[in-house]
């Protein structure tokens, strides 16, 4: 199992840090965003990516990627539906019952799920390994792809 930029759902320890103030302020605009205005949506998504990326943000690449996404989707607002999910089952402490070999990959400067979330997850899963990506936010920059792939391959071989 490989968990990337994740949090320990069902966490029952001391409070873990959450979204950065910049991210909360940005997401506060979701309610007033005109989802029929492609330029406004693209600008909102580009700022979301900038806030997620950390120092490796490539505005040109991300703008092109967002255009491609908007060309292919009928409902860009649905990208944010996961925030409305709820569960009926109590998951308190359930992550501690994971029994398979687990690798947790987390960005050092993640503004959505700050590093203590990844650390708590890795510490709570028996024998889990933690790979911290220096200078990285919530997204996986291309400069880390090869190292992540090697680490996942080694993790799989060792499982």
Where are these regions (language model features)?
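Flexible "cap/lid" loop of the alpha/beta hydrolase fold
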Residues: 2-34
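Alpha/beta-hydrolase
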Residues: 21-93, 100, 120
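Short beta-strand/loop motif that positions the catalytic acidic residue
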Residues: 98, 104-106
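Active-site acidic short loop of glycosyltransferases
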Residues: 99-100, 127
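Catalytic active-site module of serine/aspartate enzymes centered on a nucleophile-bearing elbow/loop
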Residues: 127-159
């Amino acid at each position: 199992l490989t968990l990337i930029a994740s949090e320990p759902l069902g966490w029952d320890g001391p409070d873990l840090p959450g979204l950065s103030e910049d991210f909360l302020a940005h997401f506060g605009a979701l309610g007033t965003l005109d989802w029929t205005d492609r330029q406004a949506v693209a600008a909102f998504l580009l700022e979301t990516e900038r806030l997620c990326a950390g120092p490796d943000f490539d505005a040109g690449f991300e703008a092109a990627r967002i255009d491609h996404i908007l060309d292919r989707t009928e409902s860009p607002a649905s990208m944010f539906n996961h925030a409305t999910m709820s569960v009926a089952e109590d998951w308190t402490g359930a992550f501690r019952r994971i029994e398979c070999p687990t690798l947790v990959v987390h960005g050092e400067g993640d503004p959505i799920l700050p590093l203590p979330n990844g650390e708590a997850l890795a510490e709570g899963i028996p024998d889990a390994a933690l790979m911290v990506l220096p200078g990285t936010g919530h997204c996986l920059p291309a400069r880390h792809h090869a190292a992540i792939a090697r680490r996942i391959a080694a993790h799989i071989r060792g499982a």
